[in-house]
Amino acid sequence: MKPEPRTLPPSPNWYCSRCSDAAPGGIFGFAARTSVFLVRVGPGAGASPGAPPFRVVGELVGHTERVSGFTFSHHPGQYNLCATSSDDGTVKVWDVETKTVVTEHTLHQHTISALHWSPTVKDLIVSGDEKGVVFCYWLNRNDSQHLFTEPRTIFCLTCSPHHENLVAIGYKDGIVVIIDISKKGEVIHRLRGHDDEIHSIAWCPLSGEDCLSISQEENSEEPDIPNGKLIAETPITKGCYLATGSKDQTIRIWSCSRGRGVMVLKLPFLKRRSGGVDPTVKERLWLTLHWPKNQPTQLVSSCFGGELLLWDLTQSWRRKYTLFSTSAEGHNHSRIVFNLCSLKTEDGKQLLLSTSMDRDVKCWDMATLECCWTLPSLGGFAYSLAFSPVDVGSLAIGVGDGMIRVWNTLSIKNNYDVKNFWQGVKSKVTALCWHPNKEGCLAFGTDDGKVGLYDTCSNKPPQISSTYHKKTVYRLAWGPPVPPMSLGGEGDRPSLTLYSCGGEGVVLQHNPWKLSGEAFDINKLVRDTNSIRYKLPVHTEISWKGDGKVLALGNEDGSIEIFQVPNLRLLCTIQQHHKLVNAIVWHHEHGSRPELSCLLASGSNNAVIYVHNLKAVLESNPESPITITEPYRTLSGHTAKITSLAWSPHHDGRLVSACYDGTAQVWDALREEPLFNFRGHRGRLLCVAWSPVDPECIYSGADDFCVYRWLTSMQDHSRPPQGKKCIELEKKRLSQFKPKLKKKKKPTLRLPVKQDSSVGNEDESVKENSGPAENGLSDQDGEEEAQEPELPPSPVVCVEPVSCTDICSGFEKSKVTVSSKATSLKKEPAKEKPEALLKKRKARSMLPLSTSLDHRSKEELHRDCLVLATATHAKAELNEDVSADLEERFHLGLFTDRATLYRMMETEGKGHLESGHPELFHQLMLWKGDLKGVLQAAAERGELTDSLVAVAPVAGYSVWLWAVEAFAKQLCFQDQYVKAASYLLSIHKVYEAVELLKSNHLYREAIAVAKARLRPEDPVLKELYLSWGSILERDGHYAIAAKCYLGATSAYDAAKVLARKGDAASLRTAAELAAIAGEHELAASLALRCAQELLLMKNWVGAQEALGLHESLQGQRLVFCLLELLCRHLEEKQPLEVRGPSSIYHQWATGSEGTLVQRVTGVWRSAFSVDTPEQCQAALQKLQDVKYPSATSNTPFRQLLLHVCHDLTLAMLSQQAAAWEEAVPALLQAVVRSYTSGNFTLMQEIYSAFLPGGCDHLRDKLGDLSPAMAAYKSLEAFCIYGQLYEVWWSLCGPGPESSVWVLSAESTVSDKQSKPEDSASAEDMEQPPGPGPRLSAESERLLSACKELFSERHASLQTSQRTVAEVQETLAEMIRQHQKSQLCKATTNGPSRDEPSRDEPSQEAERAPSQPPSPTEERNAPVSLPELTRRLTEANERIAEFPESVKAWPFPDVLECCLVLLHIGSQCPDAVDPEMQQQAQELLHKYGHTRAYRRHCQSRHT
């Protein structure tokens, strides 16, 4: 059984009464998010020698929401069974050995809050929910019982260890009841005393009440009456003690025989070792209990700040307790403890395990009360991993819980030696980067845009940069300073500065010596240095080359830009990805092949990884930027976006990738082969890092809150999952914790959600379960981000575009506030029926209260008349009685003086407001003539109307201005932004109106207003176009975005955004647009991409039309012409099964007159007007700037054909221009591409079509002293090599062209007629000679020319190269075997020494075809490291002695040719010159000692 990968698990769930438990077999489990993690504890854990005896051994996966309860069965024979409860409403029973569900039930209708496996009944599981319902479930008989005792929220429950029918239940309000489940839940005791939540209940491990000598008098705080009402006398013969812990900061001991409390223990206020006591401690207290089985007189409890207390219950009057871990500083929990459970190990140790809010699981020795070990955990996504280049083995982990972990992965004494850093972070840590030279200097970036530096070797708080990113920090990198920071002397500036890339697309350069200073945006330097006029792309990734001379920037549009220091001059742009670039990594500098340091791997939101070789670009240092459209290697296999990449520091060209498909993949990038696939995560991978000390060890982090350490050789899979497996992984991911918060689409850039550090672990789990953060802008993949908890609905507040000014002297300046009850837009009234048109609704009365008072009884009306008469005819002032009457009869103000009338109108106005008719109140105020008061009151209440604003000019111009501004602000609260902008325009606030529309994403309206009211050259208009274009581009509306960029006179950006779609139509339109705008380089690159897309669709006509859009692509048109004719030629010779779209050929491609070369030159002359040497030379110069990577066996055939035709076009143009020294290397390059890709047929077609008469005429053209003579010899050798194989295969049976080589073939037809690979297999070499056919004269002439293949210099060079490769392979195998042996020693459940490891047979099987095994005694003979070093040194010295002319050009394998010739001689003895046979045998004898030819040579000699 292979060992489990080492795991940093998710944090145990918070605020659950029982979320961890331990079984007597040495298994401890704790609930974390939607799973349960299992930890093997004790000597049998299989931990490393000297390390603490524990190991994470597995995970129980099956719930879809948070696990709220976990309990083991403590009955002999079923220690492997456990039960879990979850917020998904299920209770599951598991087998921890198989990690599968045994059974489950969904009886609860509400959230389950408590769970326990009865310690006395082996198949009884009791659970309770938030509504007070208890279910008893008997596992063996699949039976259940429903109990509803109290309509209260259950917080915890515990079954009695002494009486099988008793269960103690604690409620949220502090009540504790003991029920008898055999009597339908009858309450035996109701225990009152606590006044807050019951967090934990623990039964005394001993039955009876003799273990504690507690008298009633001892409990001075308890009255001499029963604590709580005793419902009924219990028939229990023996009593028992019960302990309860509550949020009210007390522990109470209860007597079950008396039904009352006998002891109260108050938690002490301890001085926290990390600081003072938090005044809000009661709100955060969780008081959990554990009553040790072998210590009935002692009780363990948690305390305020994470301390653990051991209470001595025999001395209750002294309240005696002992603190855990009093001697060791920092070994206590730093925050409250939630769960305690005990475990007895195989060696007899009594341990206590605790889980806490500080995200640590701790193990305590009950004998010494000291901490034995700590298992750290993660409370958020693992966003970033980074190994320190100085302190090797220190792995920094950026986590979404607002903390940085530094894991010492090389610690011998502790496999989980982790330090936490949280000061100054306060948000999700999304990026990390160690300083390359300074120990302990760690840079970090967060989701709120913060960049800081931590000194991990000290306890100092971090330094924080004063310059924040507007969005999430996605990448950090240390690099050389660039202007303006690089200006000055050596001592005035740091040697390395910190670069950060944020989600808004900006890269900032920070001075680590002065983070309080301003950081610089490198875009300004890029723009100035390269004279860029167009909009710079949004940057999403940054990576410095190891030597610090080159910077790579990944962009949101999928492009990658390469810059050269010190001024960031643009060298080239890589146009390969079509979506946001998430990861860029340079190959390390310390490999055995220095040229590999120029490899750049990149991953994006597409599932394909591209590797580019920039060696030619960096060495040539082009004057103007070039565009690269072809990758050096393509790594395909993932099925989702790539999030992280890392090169192996131990291998050449080995890469590991992390992907959203839930797997990490190891690649051999040079061979384009997948090697190992890790599928241990249950979520989407976010980061990956290769161990700097172990070649097989890789660390990966994901959104499942886990970091795994895994070994490549222990993986069962070699490539990412495909087909149904992808669907299963997606279902598994979706089955995780389901968010309870409402999700909504975020209108801005993709960011991690900001979280509150005081929120519980489960709440954070909800937030973290949304899509993780990624570099740059969100892609159109339907992802949503969880938002912060929603607040009650409130009016939308707009950006304040106006400011209230004094309207006039004496008019008080008022602060306009709008009530949340602001009036909304009224809907248009429904159209009335025709018959109803005649019956209009009567207008509402302006003075309804006065009118109603005039319709009272006759007596009251008469009394009104008398009061009115008295008031009007009074000669002096009114007496008190008359004044009181007038106050009461306010409606008489209509008939008295103005003051009384105002009072009447005020009363009527209040009535209108109370009845919800403020417009009538406003009219009354207008009648009074108080227009300013009306406007001010309406503005304060948010009740301004169009009519009020319309009459505002009556009060003056300043009043009108103020009223319009206030009304516009009110309209913003009512989401009527367009109307608000119209009012702002009415007072000539054009800029404010435009800004209002823009800030509310009404770009179309804003542009219309700006275009109509502002000058055409106003920068606001261009900014509007660019802002709207960016948003449209982010949302995938590329065509409309292009219009915006065109409106902003940025045609370059318009063409770029159109091309982002990547289809042929979009690329063609973008190319045409760029050509119209005069962006010729961009037009050429887009036209070429369009032609390549059409090439995949076999649309040759469309491809030529696309290339014809730009004159500089004349050379590419010739390449595509040759490619079309070659494909047509191959189809005519070998008709293939038609798959996909049918080919659309030109008319000139259908003819068959003449040879292929004649047809090509004819079409060039007639269709493309390429006839003269000058024209050929011009086309040649354009094509020579295009470089394609070398081919491999995994190169797609269509891509191989394109590259081969490019080389053939160069050769033909060179011939027509009489440049023979360039023609021969180009022709050789085409042959070598076919040879290295393993396509022997294509290689032979090249010779038959382009060199039908052989290579002799090329020798005459070159001359013996030509520099290209070495290339000619290689070309001639490959020609003979191919013909040699055709002669050999023709001996096996009559093929289509066997008559050329064989006159009479008597041998039977065999499988050799099938298309062979580029070399003979071992079986072919070993075949006995058949009947001897007679070779033709042409064959004999060829065999006599084979002496050109028997080049001793090339044989010696190839042998030295094979020796180097074999030594390197042997060294790598020695390292692997050593690590495997160490792993087997350290892992008890690993493969035994007598059994071969899992991957050995596959390795032997892989070696079988190409590396035959050597003799047994030689294979088993060990080779020392000094001997291997000597062999390697000697081989490298021999290689260095060869002239460059020999090493520059490939040559057929000389020993392979010797073997083929000897086999032909064995079949046709008279056909091969004995002298040549002797020469071949001598070469084999002299140079055949390498592994590849050793067996063949020995069999040949024997």
Curated annotation (Swiss-Prot):
<keyword id="KW-0597">Phosphoprotein</keyword>
<feature type="site" description="Interaction with U4 snRNA and with the 7-methylguanosine cap of RNA molecules">
    <location>
        <position position="684"/>
    </location>
</feature>
<feature type="modified residue" description="Phosphoserine">
    <location>
        <position position="624"/>
    </location>
</feature>
<keyword id="KW-0175">Coiled coil</keyword>
<feature type="repeat" description="WD 9">
    <location>
        <begin position="468"/>
        <end position="509"/>
    </location>
</feature>
<dbReference type="GO" id="GO:0030619">
    <property type="term" value="F:U1 snRNA binding"/>
</dbReference>
<dbReference type="InterPro" id="IPR052640">
    <property type="entry name" value="Gemin-5"/>
</dbReference>
<dbReference type="InterPro" id="IPR015943">
    <property type="entry name" value="WD40/YVTN_repeat-like_dom_sf"/>
</dbReference>
<feature type="site" description="Interaction with U4 snRNA and with the 7-methylguanosine cap of RNA molecules">
    <location>
        <position position="474"/>
    </location>
</feature>
<feature type="modified residue" description="Phosphoserine">
    <location>
        <position position="770"/>
    </location>
</feature>
<dbReference type="GO" id="GO:0034719">
    <property type="term" value="C:SMN-Sm protein complex"/>
</dbReference>
<dbReference type="Pfam" id="PF23770">
    <property type="entry name" value="Beta-prop_RIG_1st"/>
</dbReference>
<dbReference type="GO" id="GO:0006417">
    <property type="term" value="P:regulation of translation"/>
</dbReference>
<feature type="cross-link" description="Glycyl lysine isopeptide (Lys-Gly) (interchain with G-Cter in SUMO2)">
    <location>
        <position position="754"/>
    </location>
</feature>
<feature type="site" description="Interaction with U4 snRNA">
    <location>
        <position position="381"/>
    </location>
</feature>
<dbReference type="GO" id="GO:0000387">
    <property type="term" value="P:spliceosomal snRNP assembly"/>
</dbReference>
<feature type="site" description="Interaction with U4 snRNA and with the 7-methylguanosine cap of RNA molecules">
    <location>
        <position position="641"/>
    </location>
</feature>
<dbReference type="Pfam" id="PF00400">
    <property type="entry name" value="WD40"/>
</dbReference>
<dbReference type="GO" id="GO:0000340">
    <property type="term" value="F:RNA 7-methylguanosine cap binding"/>
</dbReference>
<feature type="site" description="Interaction with U4 snRNA">
    <location>
        <position position="284"/>
    </location>
</feature>
<feature type="site" description="Interaction with U4 snRNA">
    <location>
        <position position="426"/>
    </location>
</feature>
<feature type="repeat" description="WD 1">
    <location>
        <begin position="62"/>
        <end position="104"/>
    </location>
</feature>
<feature type="site" description="Interaction with U4 snRNA">
    <location>
        <position position="359"/>
    </location>
</feature>
<feature type="region of interest" description="Important for interaction with U1 snRNA">
    <location>
        <begin position="1"/>
        <end position="124"/>
    </location>
</feature>
<dbReference type="InterPro" id="IPR056420">
    <property type="entry name" value="GEMI5_RBS"/>
</dbReference>
<feature type="repeat" description="WD 5">
    <location>
        <begin position="280"/>
        <end position="321"/>
    </location>
</feature>
<feature type="site" description="Interaction with U4 snRNA">
    <location>
        <position position="470"/>
    </location>
</feature>
<dbReference type="Pfam" id="PF23774">
    <property type="entry name" value="TPR_GEMI5"/>
</dbReference>
<feature type="compositionally biased region" description="Basic and acidic residues">
    <location>
        <begin position="825"/>
        <end position="838"/>
    </location>
</feature>
<dbReference type="GO" id="GO:0017069">
    <property type="term" value="F:snRNA binding"/>
</dbReference>
<dbReference type="Pfam" id="PF23777">
    <property type="entry name" value="GEMI5_RBS"/>
</dbReference>
<feature type="compositionally biased region" description="Basic and acidic residues">
    <location>
        <begin position="1392"/>
        <end position="1407"/>
    </location>
</feature>
<dbReference type="InterPro" id="IPR001680">
    <property type="entry name" value="WD40_rpt"/>
</dbReference>
<feature type="modified residue" description="Phosphoserine">
    <location>
        <position position="757"/>
    </location>
</feature>
<feature type="site" description="Interaction with U4 snRNA">
    <location>
        <position position="422"/>
    </location>
</feature>
<keyword id="KW-0508">mRNA splicing</keyword>
<feature type="coiled-coil region">
    <location>
        <begin position="1355"/>
        <end position="1382"/>
    </location>
</feature>
<keyword id="KW-0963">Cytoplasm</keyword>
<dbReference type="InterPro" id="IPR036322">
    <property type="entry name" value="WD40_repeat_dom_sf"/>
</dbReference>
<keyword id="KW-1017">Isopeptide bond</keyword>
<dbReference type="InterPro" id="IPR011047">
    <property type="entry name" value="Quinoprotein_ADH-like_sf"/>
</dbReference>
<feature type="region of interest" description="Disordered">
    <location>
        <begin position="740"/>
        <end position="797"/>
    </location>
</feature>
